[in-house]
């Protein structure tokens, strides 16, 4: 299973433990039913949650929701993280050092010369002549650019010169050549420690000790590891907070969508009821209707008073097609127009919906006249 999904689920479960009312929302019904079907028991909702579930909820204040979400966000990643930065230095910005031509053909003579340069560089290093050691290691690298130990040795001098970025470049090159050597990881770990890169330092120093245990690397690992762990815990904390915010936002979106759907249903129901009232022969039929309609049918609006005894009325109102036409605003507007002025029927000769209703009513009333 995707670890990210597992983390999201863990954050959701934690949120449910803190606020069981989340489980009593309508969209979480499926989860409640599943828990209960497995023999589990869902904690009761708070009184507030119950009242919200049983009454129509007001539309949530989106600004308040946004403010609540922002309140959970840290002002910065370092907002409540305090790390001892003793020994951390500013990064060096020198131009990259010479790395030699890795595609050059290396002769045995060049290898011997490179070894001589390496020996001289180590002597200079032991004498404290650090820059001389750098120059000699560089000469050795140019003679034999595919020997990982030369880069690792030069990196150790860069660390002593407090040039951690230069040391990291040398260690990266040494690891490319021989990833199983402990020395490049040791010196890269020390360089990262100088820069305050605690997690990277802990990773490299631990790997160096794993490949070839070194007391010096182990001592520095013990120094940086607590800081690296503190940073990792800090990151996990805010990842959990972010996941909890995402879950809250999803629940809020579902809640808003449900409210929008319910509001749309209420509006549709109101429109349907309004249409039903509108389709009840408003305004009567003054002056009679052509086609054998009886001479005027006044008083038909608002429930058609006075027509209860009209022959055939119940049959007309039970006809599905007539009822459907009475629900159509276009048909009823035309019907009113013709009722007020029968001569206007000619305007609707080409409208089958209007003519169909008039024909049906004419037939019904004509049969009773």
Curated annotation (Swiss-Prot):
<comment type="similarity">
    <text>Belongs to the FAM10 family.</text>
</comment>
<feature type="region of interest" description="Disordered">
    <location>
        <begin position="256"/>
        <end position="300"/>
    </location>
</feature>
<keyword id="KW-0963">Cytoplasm</keyword>
<dbReference type="GO" id="GO:0005829">
    <property type="term" value="C:cytosol"/>
</dbReference>
<dbReference type="GO" id="GO:0030544">
    <property type="term" value="F:Hsp70 protein binding"/>
</dbReference>
<dbReference type="InterPro" id="IPR011990">
    <property type="entry name" value="TPR-like_helical_dom_sf"/>
</dbReference>
<dbReference type="GO" id="GO:0006457">
    <property type="term" value="P:protein folding"/>
</dbReference>
<keyword id="KW-0007">Acetylation</keyword>
<feature type="compositionally biased region" description="Gly residues">
    <location>
        <begin position="281"/>
        <end position="300"/>
    </location>
</feature>
<dbReference type="GO" id="GO:0051085">
    <property type="term" value="P:chaperone cofactor-dependent protein refolding"/>
</dbReference>
<feature type="modified residue" description="Phosphoserine; by GRK5">
    <location>
        <position position="346"/>
    </location>
</feature>
<keyword id="KW-0677">Repeat</keyword>
<feature type="modified residue" description="N6-acetyllysine">
    <location>
        <position position="353"/>
    </location>
</feature>
<feature type="modified residue" description="N6-acetyllysine">
    <location>
        <position position="360"/>
    </location>
</feature>
<protein>
    <recommendedName>
        <fullName>Hsc70-interacting protein</fullName>
    </recommendedName>
</protein>
<feature type="repeat" description="TPR 2">
    <location>
        <begin position="148"/>
        <end position="181"/>
    </location>
</feature>
<dbReference type="GO" id="GO:0030674">
    <property type="term" value="F:protein-macromolecule adaptor activity"/>
</dbReference>
<dbReference type="GO" id="GO:0009617">
    <property type="term" value="P:response to bacterium"/>
</dbReference>
<keyword id="KW-0802">TPR repeat</keyword>
<feature type="region of interest" description="Disordered">
    <location>
        <begin position="38"/>
        <end position="97"/>
    </location>
</feature>
<comment type="function">
    <text>One HIP oligomer binds the ATPase domains of at least two HSC70 molecules dependent on activation of the HSC70 ATPase by HSP40. Stabilizes the ADP state of HSC70 that has a high affinity for substrate protein. Through its own chaperone activity, it may contribute to the interaction of HSC70 with various target proteins.</text>
</comment>
<dbReference type="Pfam" id="PF18253">
    <property type="entry name" value="HipN"/>
</dbReference>
<dbReference type="Pfam" id="PF17830">
    <property type="entry name" value="STI1-HOP_DP"/>
</dbReference>
<dbReference type="InterPro" id="IPR019734">
    <property type="entry name" value="TPR_rpt"/>
</dbReference>
<dbReference type="GO" id="GO:0070062">
    <property type="term" value="C:extracellular exosome"/>
</dbReference>
<feature type="repeat" description="TPR 3">
    <location>
        <begin position="182"/>
        <end position="215"/>
    </location>
</feature>
<feature type="compositionally biased region" description="Basic and acidic residues">
    <location>
        <begin position="49"/>
        <end position="73"/>
    </location>
</feature>
<dbReference type="InterPro" id="IPR034649">
    <property type="entry name" value="Hip_N"/>
</dbReference>
<feature type="repeat" description="TPR 1">
    <location>
        <begin position="114"/>
        <end position="147"/>
    </location>
</feature>
<keyword id="KW-0597">Phosphoprotein</keyword>
<dbReference type="InterPro" id="IPR006636">
    <property type="entry name" value="STI1_HS-bd"/>
</dbReference>
<feature type="domain" description="STI1">
    <location>
        <begin position="319"/>
        <end position="358"/>
    </location>
</feature>
<dbReference type="GO" id="GO:0046983">
    <property type="term" value="F:protein dimerization activity"/>
</dbReference>
<dbReference type="GO" id="GO:0005737">
    <property type="term" value="C:cytoplasm"/>
</dbReference>
<dbReference type="Pfam" id="PF13181">
    <property type="entry name" value="TPR_8"/>
</dbReference>
<comment type="subunit">
    <text>Homotetramer. Interacts with HSC70 as well as DNAJ homologs and HSP90. Interacts (via the C-terminus 303- 319 AA) with GRK5.</text>
</comment>
<feature type="compositionally biased region" description="Basic and acidic residues">
    <location>
        <begin position="256"/>
        <end position="272"/>
    </location>
</feature>
<dbReference type="InterPro" id="IPR041243">
    <property type="entry name" value="STI1/HOP_DP"/>
</dbReference>
<keyword id="KW-0143">Chaperone</keyword>
């Amino acid at each position: 299973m995707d670890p990210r999904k597992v983390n999201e689920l863990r954050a959701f479960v934690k949120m449910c433990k803190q606020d069981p009312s989340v489980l009593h929302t309508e969209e979480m019904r499926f989860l409640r039913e599943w828990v209960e079907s497995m023999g589990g028991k869902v904690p009761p909702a708070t009184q507030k949650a119950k009242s919200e579930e049983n009454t129509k909820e007001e539309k949530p204040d989106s600004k308040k929701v946004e403010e609540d979400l922002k309140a959970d966000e840290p002002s910065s990643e370092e907002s409540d993280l305090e790390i001892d930065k003793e020994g951390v230095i500013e990064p060096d910005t020198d131009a990259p050092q010479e790395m030699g031509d890795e595609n050059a053909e290396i002769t045995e003579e060049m290898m011997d010369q490179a070894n001589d340069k390496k020996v001289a560089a180590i002597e200079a290093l032991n004498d404290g002549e650090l820059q001389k050691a750098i120059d000699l290691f560089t000469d050795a690298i140019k003679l034999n650019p595919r020997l990982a130990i030369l880069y690792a040795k030069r990196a150790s001098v860069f660390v002593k010169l407090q040039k951690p970025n230069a040391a990291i470049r040398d260690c990266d090159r040494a690891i490319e050549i021989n990833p199983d050597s402990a020395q490049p990881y040791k010196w890269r770990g020390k360089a990262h420690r100088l820069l305050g890169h605690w997690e990277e330092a802990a990773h490299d120093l631990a790997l160096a000790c794993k490949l070839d245990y070194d007391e010096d690397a182990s001592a520095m690992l013990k120094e940086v590891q607590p800081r690296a762990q503190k940073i990792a815990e800090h990151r996990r904390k805010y990842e959990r907070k972010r996941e909890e915010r995402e879950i809250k936002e999803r629940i809020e979106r579902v809640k808003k969508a449900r409210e929008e759907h319910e509001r749309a249903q209420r509006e549709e129901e109101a429109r349907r009821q309004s249409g039903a009232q509108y389709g009840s022969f408003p305004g009567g039929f003054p002056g009679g209707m052509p086609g054998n309609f009886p001479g005027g049918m006044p008083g038909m609006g608002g429930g058609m008073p006075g027509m209860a005894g009209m022959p055939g009325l119940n049959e007309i109102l039970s006809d599905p097609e007539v009822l459907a036409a009475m629900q159509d605003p276009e048909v009823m507007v035309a019907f009113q127009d013709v009722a007020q002025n029968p001569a206007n029927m000619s305007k609707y000769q080409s409208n089958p919906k209007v003519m169909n209703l008039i024909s049906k009513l004419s037939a019904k009333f004509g049969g009773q006249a």
